[in-house]
């Protein structure tokens, strides 16, 4: 086997590989031994007919596919080793049919790590909203908690209001005659939910438990039951029970019930602390997003389509998992959105391209700045993974195998982005509350 590197262009290595006639014959013999077991030739037991007769009856091409599966992978791997080429994605082959007694040539286009040319990416100016936590953010969080832990209280003497839940009996009549589907008992109705036809719920406001009322309504012209559409109706409604929710009072008792704190002031401080942590996380993510966008514009990163395709497939798999959590398959999603896999792949292609180029840019930056990930840092990260998955450290290391080096690369990329963020000139140009950011 001989291999020749013809050129490297746009992060793809073009190589020509030649396999000797002896290796071709070895591949054809391998294919013959495999194929002959699967066919029956009159006059011979299965697997015993000579190769010449097999080729005569089915044609020489009957052996080509299996012969290529034997010849090409081994020759390709040896060529990569000989030429010291490290592929980053699957190659594309240009292959002709092999001929017995003749050397066999084929070409491979191999995606390789791009030669990244970094521009002036230190000190990039980025503009982000102001994520400062304000007092109204804390107040809103408290209000959300008051509603979350609101108590359900029965109204005995007070009249019903919008938002209350009523237990009612009702029966509807048109021209004095009851109609099918117009009766219900012990029906739970939240006023303002628009569960009933327009005008029904509003007429129950002000009623007390134990009271009754004739509710006059008109069915919409577009009502699903055609025999009722556009007709006037009277519903005899009896209110049996009224419940309302009362927001909790903000005091020490509330703090003790909903948190580990003894006083409302301690809870307030913790709420502000959590909001500030979330705001800082969003601030950093906002800086990172704009910073990466601008940094990539300053760099030359030729990435082969095959590598971007791999990222598209990873994104598709992630999306498919998210859909599965919602009880949908990817095919169902495509049906609902009148789309298909190809359209979706094209839609996410720009995002995939930015992601791939961003990683290569940050890897190059880490290399130029001499950034390394120590064994201690790597082990600390693996320990966190083990804790998250409830596994022993040794077990998760065994499961990860060679993927541990991918983790090391990821940590190095994290260091590079932190470096860029530290060097960036950040201008906060607009205000946005932490609650709105959430």
Swiss-Prot record:
Give the molecular function GO annotations. Answer: peptidyl-prolyl cis-trans isomerase activity; protein folding chaperone; ribosome binding
State where it is primarily located. Answer: cytoplasm
Which Enzyme Commission numbers does its entry carry?
A: 5.2.1.8
GO BP, one annotated term: cell division
Q: Which UniProt keywords apply?
A: Cell cycle, Cell division, Chaperone, Cytoplasm, Isomerase, Rotamase
Its function? Involved in protein export. Acts as a chaperone by maintaining the newly synthesized protein in an open conformation. Functions as a peptidyl-prolyl cis-trans isomerase.
The free-text domain note is: Consists of 3 domains; the N-terminus binds the ribosome, the middle domain has PPIase activity, while the C-terminus has intrinsic chaperone activity on its own.
Record protein name field? Trigger factor
**To which species is this protein native?**
Syntrophomonas wolfei subsp. wolfei (strain DSM 2245B / Goettingen)
């Amino acid at each position: 086997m001989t291999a020749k590197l013809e050129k490297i262009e746009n992060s793809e290595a073009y190589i020509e590989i030649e396999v000797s006639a002896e290796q071709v014959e070895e591949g054809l013999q391998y294919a013959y031994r495999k194929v002959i077991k699967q066919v029956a030739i009159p006059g011979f037991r299965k697997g015993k007919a000579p190769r010449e007769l097999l080729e005569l009856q089915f044609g020489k091409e009957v052996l080509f596919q299996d012969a290529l599966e034997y010849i090409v992978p081994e020759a390709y791997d040896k060529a990569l080793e000989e030429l010291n080429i490290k592929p980053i994605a699957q190659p594309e082959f240009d292959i002709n049919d092999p001929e017995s007694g003749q050397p066999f040539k084929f070409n491979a286009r191999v995606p390789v790590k791009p030669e990244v040319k970094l521009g002036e990416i230190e000190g990039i100016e980025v503009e982000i909203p102001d994520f400062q936590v304000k007092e109204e953010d804390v107040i809103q969080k408290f209000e959300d908690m008051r509603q979350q832990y609101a108590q359900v209280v029965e109204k005995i003497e007070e009249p019903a209001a919008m938002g209350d839940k009523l237990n009612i009996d009702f029966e509807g009549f048109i021209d004095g005659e009851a109609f099918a589907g117009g009766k219900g008992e012990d029906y739970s109705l939240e006023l303002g939910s628009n569960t009933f036809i327009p005008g029904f719920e509003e007429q129950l406001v002000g009623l007390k438990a134990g009271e009754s009322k004739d509710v006059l309504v008109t069915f919409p012209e577009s009502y699903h039951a055609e025999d009722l559409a556009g007709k006037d109706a009277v519903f005899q409604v009896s209110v049996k029970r009224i419940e309302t929710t009362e927001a909790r009072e903000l005091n020490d008792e509330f703090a003790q019930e909903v948190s580990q704190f003894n006083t409302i002031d301690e809870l307030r401080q913790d709420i502000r602390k959590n909001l500030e942590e979330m705001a800082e996380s969003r601030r950093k993510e906002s800086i990172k997003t704009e910073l990466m966008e601008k940094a990539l514009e300053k760099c030359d990163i030729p990435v082969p389509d095959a590598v971007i395709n791999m990222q598209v497939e990873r994104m598709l798999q992630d999306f498919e998992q998210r859909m599965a959590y919602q009880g949908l398959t990817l095919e169902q999603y495509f049906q609902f959105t009148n789309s298909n896999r190809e359209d979706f792949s094209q839609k996410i292609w720009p995002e995939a391209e930015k992601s791939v180029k961003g990683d290569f840019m940050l890897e190059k930056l880490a290399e130029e700045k001499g950034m390394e990930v120590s064994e201690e840092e790597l082990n600390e990260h693996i320990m966190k993974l083990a804790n998250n998955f409830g596994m022993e450290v040794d077990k998760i290391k065994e499961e990860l195998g060679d993927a541990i080096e991918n983790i090391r690369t990821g940590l190095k990329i994290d260091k590079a982005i932190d470096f860029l963020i530290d060097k960036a000139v950040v201008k906060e140009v607009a205000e946005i509350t932490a609650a709105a950011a959430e």
